[in-house]
Design a protein with these regions (language model features):
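Surface-exposed acidic, glycine/proline-enriched linker/cap segments
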Residues: 232-240, 245, 279-298
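Short, charged, amphipathic alpha-helix that recurs within catalytic cores of restriction-modification
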Residues: 1-11, 281
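Preference for the N-terminal adenyl/adenosyl cofactor-binding alpha/beta module
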Residues: 1, 12-269, 302, 306-315, ...
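SAM-dependent nucleic-acid methyltransferase catalytic core
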Residues: 285-304, 308-358
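Short amphipathic alpha-helical leader/targeting segments
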Residues: 95, 225, 280, 330-331
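Post-Walker A helix-loop "phosphate-sensing" segment adjacent to the P-loop in P-loop NTPases
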Residues: 272-277
């Protein structure tokens, strides 16, 4: 509405339709609050889609309560989510390549098709000629990181219900999910105990920052702000580079990391601070020359977690990989150059076990 002529350009929203048009009132909220709210909504919706996939697969196992079946299904869901995210985030070269691959098969043929795809995603390019791949499969990248390495998982018969659940998930935009929230929602959605209690449980981003900000993040931001006050450019550049190296030298441990939301949000916060450093160092200039040069020094290898639940640990790894991908995209916008995410180059140091016994 134009406040000078309020009678013009007025948008009227009936109270019953408010939930469909809430975005029109975003101006009443802080931009950051609006963004976090959208990320929460997206991540919860994504969690529900994963829940549908999980339930549809679970019905097909001969012994759905067995440890082997549940472990296999957990790994399968993590892989499927990674593929869904990768095609929307541009990590797979062709748009909708995974959804398109799934769509072309009848349910009875989908199981071997998935097994073939997982094999390809775990095979380095030099080893692929031995697989005699179709052009379609050859187009998928090598992922690395061990996500698709275990060939011992059980994939049951795939039904039309499963294919429909995958198709529905394929229509969702996974690119903008919050890995901090989604990791916890994902684990909560598929955790049998939590499911019986009927809800999704996670620590909000706001509450995570109530812990990490006073612990170390506020001090780091203040140090960065102080560097920006340096008037001599050569000295300022030197201090910025030293500060970036300092961030890259920090190590973090969560001895009961769950689905990794504290580690993931800490990583994102440090990478955003690093991007601020790069923005100052680059000053809007395009980098030419060595295409192998990587401006990023903060790595997920600096983050360690211990988790007794193997599935939560797998989710934590995936959340950190998604966070790494999203932050790399933000860095590309800062340094104005393309950076390759795949194959995965950083180790995720999430260890499965009892922290009191390790």
């Amino acid at each position: 509405m134009d406040t000078r002529v309020p009678e013009n350009n007025v948008v009227k929203i009936h109270i019953d339709d408010l939930h469909h048009n809430s975005s029109l009132l975003d101006f009443l909220l802080e931009k950051k609050v609006v963004q976090v709210s959208k990320e929460v909504d997206l991540s919860q919706e994504a969690g529900k889609l994963v829940g549908k996939i999980y339930d549809a697969f679970l019905k097909q196992y001969h012994d759905p309560e067995s440890k082997k079946a549940l472990e296999s299904l957990n790994v399968l869901c993590v892989r499927l989510v990674f593929c869904l995210y990768s095609e929307d985030a541009g990590l797979f070269e062709q748009k909708d390549s995974f959804s398109g691959y799934i769509a072309q098969y009848e349910p009875k043929d989908l199981r071997p098709a998935l097994l073939s795809l997982f094999k390809v995603l775990d095979t380095p390019y030099p080893d692929r000629p031995d697989l005699y791949l179709s052009e379609e499969l050859e187009a998928f990248p090598y992922v690395n990181g061990g996500l698709f390495a275990n060939e011992d998982i059980i994939i049951p018969k795939i039904t039309q219900e499963i294919k429909d659940a995958l198709a529905e998930a394929g229509h969702f935009n996974w690119r903008d999910i919050s890995p901090t929230i989604f990791g916890a929602v994902f684990e909560s959605t598929l955790n049998p105990v939590t499911r019986r209690k009927g809800g999704m449980h996670y620590t909000s981003i706001e509450n995570i920052h109530k812990v990490i900000d006073p612990l170390f993040l506020d001090d780091l931001k203040n140090e960065f702000a102080e560097i920006l006050t340096i008037g001599v450019q050569k000295q300022k550049k030197k201090k910025l580079e030293e500060f970036q190296n300092k961030l890259a030298g920090l190590t973090f441990l969560d001895p009961a990391c769950g689905s990794g939301n504290f580690l993931t949000e800490t990583y994102i916060s440090l990478r955003r601070l690093e991007n601020d450093i790069l923005r100052e160092l680059q000053n809007g200039q395009v980098i030419f020359g060595d295409t192998n040069w990587n401006p990023i020094k903060v790595s997920i290898s600096q983050f360690y977690g211990i988790e007794i639940n193997d599935f939560a640990g797998d989710v934590a790894k995936t959340a950190l990989w998604i966070a790494e991908s999203q932050m790399m995209k933000e860095t590309e916008d800062v340094v104005l150059m393309h950076l390759d995410f795949l194959p995965l180059k950083s180790n995720v140091n999430i260890h499965i076990g009892n922290a009191l016994q390790m």
